[in-house]
Amino acid sequence: MFASIVGAISNFMYSYLLIVMLVAVGLYYTLRTRLVQLRMFKETIRVILEKPVGADAVSSFQALMVSTASRVGTGNIIGISTAICLGGYGAVFWMWVMAIVGGASAFIESTLAQIYKKRGEHGSYGGPAYYIEAALGSRALAVIFSIALIATYGVGFNMLCAYNLQSTFIAYSFYNEATTPWVIGGILAVLVGYCLFGGGRRVIAATSTLVPIMGVIYISVAFVLTLINIDQLPAVLGKIFSQAFDFQAIFSGFAGSCVMFGIKRGLYSNEAGVGSAPNAAAAADVSHPVKQGLVQMLSVFIDTLLICTATAFMCMTSGVEPVKELAGAPYVQTALAASMGGVAKVFITVSMVLFAFTTLLGNLYYVDNCFAYIMKAVPGPTFNMVYRAIACVVIFIGAGSSMGLMWDLADVLMGCMAIINLPVICILGGPALKAMDDYSKQREAGKNPVFVAKSIGITQKLDYWQK
């Protein structure tokens, strides 16, 4: 009953609300920024290659490479394979479309996060909650957004992540549908709890080191296997474009169409316009907000157009046909096995264990920040203990739940964030657009752009950009 209700809400949100909002806002800012995705692409590369500001500082290029490698996970691997199995080859095309138009939305929201960021003891912080309160003057809406983010990352994404991790074990003979998910969920919950309650520093350090390495290995394997099966690529591309524009199939069952799955899984992977990336963008130390807007825009392209496409091509050129029964980890494992043999399932399992574990901890970091915003202070030890215990229980339950429910729940909660953030960035886009023009003028004058809020008409007192 609950699963069917959540599924119906998800279908309604993405069939009638989010598809219009995501495309409309993306196209709107693509036009308002005068195709910033293409026009400033060369400048984006220049920003990425800028030297760090200090001897101990991390360069933009290093930060981007580490974050990109670390983002290879459930969204890029299992999310894309699920989209292909349930939505067909055409889902890949609509995933590309959402990444391209979504890049403009990502540029705006991350630039806003930089403009309105706050000064903290250990650097800057911010995100949608902060620009909603500072620029719109609505703490109530900011709190609602924070609650939506807590629900999305602390519940929806972590439950889905736990499910996706345990689903990689389906390929093994010892897997028992009734017991194995709960056993794996229990082990995962204990490990996460061990790290959350003050221990596990070595575990966190080890996984943080291994994840970027495994990310690079995964991307390399995906490209190599695609090259091995390069003769299949023309046929695959033909299916992608033909199915993407099979309008009879699309509109006869829109909720299950390639458009819908392309949008859902693309959004889950790159999060453009959702309002999560600005939380990380606000922490960057740059001379001009637009620099971080460009970096986050490029991150969307790398995440979807590069990494997700690598997964899609690796699977689709393998000769293994995507069917509903293989949705999720089994399709990736079966596709890899066609070229790598039995080692494929072990490779995917090890990859997902590392990716999922760090994702679970990273998601809870976002949650911590939102609780701090809502409570106007860092939560006390008793609150943290209760919340972290609940977080572990949520992970355990997620591992033993059904695939359909977990994806639908994550989609609905993520959609709630987007429904709040997209109208907000439409209302507040003015300062970001003015900042972009200010940046362009300084670059045309041969300067390294330095932002001063008053230069674009922002008169309110900000923690940064005063002079």
Protein language model regions, located:
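Extracellular/periplasmic helix-exit of transmembrane alpha-helices
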Residues: 30, 107-117, 121, 223-239, ...
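Extracellular loop-to-transmembrane helix junctions
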Residues: 7-43, 85-123, 302-310, 345, ...
